[in-house]
UniProtKB/Swiss-Prot annotation:
Primary localisation category: membrane
Glycosylation sites: N41
Record's protein name: Early nodulin-like protein 6
A GO MF term: electron transfer activity
Domain Phytocyanin as annotated: residue spans: 24-127
Organism, as annotated: Arabidopsis thaliana
Chain's role: May act as a carbohydrate transporter.
Keyword list, A-Z: Cell membrane, Disulfide bond, Glycoprotein, GPI-anchor, Lipoprotein, Membrane, Signal
Prosegment residue ranges: 150-177
Subcellular location, record wording: Cell membrane
Phylogenetic placement of the source organism: Eukaryota, Viridiplantae, Streptophyta, Embryophyta, Tracheophyta
Length: 177
């Protein structure tokens, strides 16, 4: 009976380690990508998409676009849809931005008129949790977000996490023998 408790504890530790080191890559806008909203009633599609996802420190946002750009700006610049000194400017058709801190990130298109038409987005990154309240779920996304696999991709923050987990399991198994 004591051996079973050790195995269960080891499995819990393994899941906890993976939850700490895994991050998610999101495709901005989901299946639609980083595009100009097609009509005025879609002007908030990016913020609606962002509000349906849970972003953590270490996650990344991939912006895919053609003949466009993406800028990371301040809140004031976001509201005005203009900037002279963006934190990031990219027009390479495929831009990946790492969410490196908790808080708000403001994104706008750098093409004249696109931001005013709704090609802008606010992403809220969650505070880092110091201790888990319960075992981590299999995914931090709502079930509806799993419909399109190309919009969200799990990745690993570092390769060592797998080795740590395997080591814990091997040590546990050999300690029971």
């Amino acid at each position: 009976m004591g051996g079973q408790k050790i195995v269960l504890l080891s499995i819990f530790v393994c899941f906890y380690v993976f939850s700490l080191v895994s991050c998610t890559e999101f495709e901005a806008g989901g299946e639609n990508g980083w595009i100009i909203p097609q009509s005025s009633n879609q002007s908030d599609i990016f913020n609606q998409w962002a509000s349906k996802n849970r972003f953590k420190v270490g996650d990344t946002i991939r912006f895919k676009y053609k003949k466009d750009s993406v800028l990371v700006v301040t809140e004031d610049e976001y509201k005005k849809c203009q900037t002279t000194k963006p934190e990031l400017y990219s027009n390479h058709d495929d831009t990946v931005f790492k969410l490196d801190r908790p808080g708000l990130f403001y994104f706008i298109s750098g093409v004249s008129g696109h931001c005013e038409q709704g090609q802008k987005m606010i992403i809220k990154v969650m505070e880092v949790e110091s201790t888990p309240q319960s075992p981590p779920p299999s995914s931090s996304l709502p079930a509806s977000a799993h419909k399109k696999n190309h919009a969200v991709r799990k990745t690993s923050r570092f390769l060592g996490a797998g080795l740590v987990t395997i080591s814990i399991l091997v040590i546990t198994v050999f300690s029971l023998v």
